[in-house]
Amino acid sequence: MNKGIEAQEILQIRQDFPLFRNDPVIYLDNSATTQKPDAVLNAVSEFYGHDNANPFRGIYDLSEQATERYEAARETVSKFIHAERPSEIVFTRNASESLNLAANCLAELLLQPGDEVIVTIVEHHSNFLPWLQAAKRHGAALKFLECDAKGEIPLEALEEAITDRTRLVTMTQMSNVFGREYDVKAAAALCHSKGDIVVIADGSQSVPHIKVDVQDLGVDFLAFSGHKMLA
């Protein structure tokens, strides 16, 4: 690609963001949160200015329109990650809340004293602390998968860690520190072949940057954040 054209395209893209139009800053913290383009800001402003109402609770026009928009957004997200049906999509404030919700709910259903939860050493705190707390509450063991010198998590290490007391495995699909992609699909297949093990994937870094097909991935739960992908 011609570097001059590429540079011009970048300049044009920057014009979609109020921050970048008014400031020459080079923003490199997109793994934490992304800046918002005009299209997103205008859509939010338009809704609150002209269409604001609570969804799912009113029989007047504004409320019914809000419900339709809410469900349309759910369907859009469902198609984006190729979920089997829109009802599989649960809106929360962010991936951290999603993972906390999963930990609190699943621990009540799955964990007994002596059971095991497996996490990797490369997890964001949002996919580590909730499981640590859940394991303590229920008398379960939290087991860590170490990475090798290249930052990889060998599938063999996961297979060795799984026992007949393993109830849940949770891991990131892409590290927020290394940027490395992890083979969650293979991990999910391995876990499910070993028994009724629930598999959770943190897709906070992967969903914004690579194509994610949740049905092909084979995990039981996938968490990600809209605010990390311009929304």
Regions found by a protein language model. Give the residues of each.
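Pyridoxal 5′-phosphate
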Residues: M1-A231
